[in-house]
Amino acid sequence: MHRRGTISPRSLAGVPALGELLVAAVMVVGVAGVVVPVLPGLFLVWAAGIGWVWLDGGGPTRIVVGVLLTVLFVVGTVAKYVLPARSATGAGAPRSTLLLGAAGGLAGFFLIPVVGVVVGGVGAVYLAELVRLQHPGAAWRSTWAVLRAVGIGMLIELATAVLMLGTWTVGVLVT
């Protein structure tokens, strides 16, 4: 029993767990943001993990988790752009086509709710390749190569987000 007005460890028992549930929820939203590219998924997962490290005062284990999360975030972010770009350009699509596809996806995001990113991105890539190649079949094959490359990037980002979530989970269990 404790005196009125004092705080006992027992009275705060739910606060860290509630904070960790909030971090977990943000991380799950981040993973979903990788699959449905409306939110910056990988960044959300990383920011939630770093917030967990920082807001609770750090400590050696948490700092190691924070460093691991940051390394995974940087490596995953670089890989999700570099590897698909190499794959697409290796299939014959120039970087200008990739940039036009990104611009089309961005425009589609604002112009067509829900599916605009896909419609705008694919449409822009196909039109760019049609202008460049002057043949619908060749443009479609090139568009598929770019779509496969984008899929590779999404898989890399998803794998990184899941690894980050797993790293954080181990950190929670250890601390």
Language model segments and positions:
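Hydrophobic alpha-helical transmembrane segments
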Residues: 20-24, 46, 66-71, 98-102, ...
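Alpha-helical transmembrane segments of multi-pass membrane proteins
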Residues: 26, 30, 52, 72-81, ...
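Transmembrane alpha-helix interface/packing and boundary motifs in multi-pass membrane proteins
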Residues: 28-44, 104-114
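Interfacial segments of multi-pass membrane proteins
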Residues: 44-61, 104-109, 123-132
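Short amphipathic alpha-helical coupling elements at transmembrane boundaries
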Residues: 52, 86-93, 138-149
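Helix-adjacent hinge/juxtasegments
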Residues: 64-108
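Juxtamembrane interface at the ends
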Residues: 84-90, 121-137
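Juxtamembrane boundary at the C-terminal end of a transmembrane helix
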Residues: 164-175
